[in-house]
Amino acid sequence: VSATIRAIGTAVPRTSIGQGAVRDLFLDQADASRLARRIIGAAFDGSAVDTRHTVLPELDPAAGPGAFRDDAGALVSPSTGTRNDAYRVLAPPLFVASARDALERAGTAPDTVTHVVTVSCTGFTQPGPDLDVVHQLGLRPSVFRQHIGFMGCCAAFPALRIAAAFVDADPDAVVLVVCAELCTLHVRASDDPDQIVSNSVFGDGAAAAVVTSGGPGLRLDAFTTSVVAEGVDDMAWNIGDEGFEMVLSTAVPKLIGEHVGRAVAPLLGEGRPAAVPTWAVHPGGRAILDRTEEALGLPPTALAASRAVLRDHGNMSSATVFFVLAEALRSGLRAGAPVIALAFGPGLTVEAARCTVVQREPTGTGTGTGTDAGAGTDTDAGAGTDAAVGRP
């Protein structure tokens, strides 16, 4: 019996920001060069992002000042320490809210969870959010805890691999995987094209999955990992003095287009990519989705869930692929339908998984028509995620 995602839960911060308003906020910065203004306009307008969520209310131009914006409306750049202090306060409510949502959707009692795997690359703290999940949701103190840190946008896949290994070793295991990313904590005004692109696409959010042995949901059939060696310097995530710094060269979409076919080939066997109707591709950006679709010869419908999540949430790093899977499942996938999930990370790393939709067992004379995995809308993580951050 294979490991199965029984349910997916999601959570977003309360503050929603429109792409046009955020673009104008950056354009209005007095020290932005003429070239930077052109790049800002092109990056924001071509992003295919309509809205994002953030733990920083001051990024909404209609809001008042905060740690990242002064009384005159100018963006300021707090130290990495100040940003991480904000993470310590603002990340735990998102971890807890998405985990609670997943457990409720799965109908899983918190005290039956045997393993917790947490994922994040946008902040560090110990004791970590894994303990917030344990304490606030009533998990057993003896639960096994594992954290995956700083692996970037593809980190949900190593987390699912670990969960599947736990379940394979113990069919009674109940694994809770929780990803939470506060990408906007690392926003800053800059003339650097990589930072401008990051400012235009990244948002905040959290997602969780309950993984067990068998049952209805999304069965995890196989995983594969591939590294594009020539892209080792084209995507990176580093720690600077004024926040974490994204390296995202213009070569990334091209490299992905050239290598994604070989990367997913082990999951397809003799089949063609287009034979899989649904692809849950991490929406790292519009160009990445376009190149993936073109390289694999997929119809536009195959990446519909990915484009919807990019439009409504932007790129939430490791949590995003769970949002895409939940969106795909809400579309009403038939039992037995294959799904391939795919994400890209620093290195340049390509992570993928082949899944199968498993329906509920028939009861009485009726027939099962769906799965238990991720059928609802995003959870508002509540006032805790809007907690004020002291100005540096």
Where are these regions (language model features)?
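Short, well-ordered amphipathic alpha-helical segments that serve as non-catalytic structural scaffolds
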Residues: 45, 49, 90-106, 162, ...
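Active-site glycine-rich loop that binds ribose-phosphate moieties when present
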Residues: 141-143, 148, 155-162, 179-205
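Acidic-glycine-rich active-site phosphate/pyrophosphate-binding loop
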Residues: 125-139, 177-188, 232-237, 289-303
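Claisen-condensing/thiolase-fold acyl-transfer catalytic domains that form or cleave C-C bonds
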Residues: 103, 121-123, 140-142, 147-168, ...
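Glycine/charged-rich beta-loop-alpha catalytic/anionic-binding loops adjacent to active sites
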Residues: 78-79, 110-115, 135-149, 189-194, ...
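Condensing-enzyme catalytic core mediating Claisen C-C bond formation in acyl metabolism
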Residues: 1-86, 174, 183, 187-258, ...
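Conserved beta-ketoacyl condensing-enzyme motif
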Residues: 43, 47-138, 273-289
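Long, intrinsically disordered low-complexity tandem-repeat segments
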Residues: 365-387
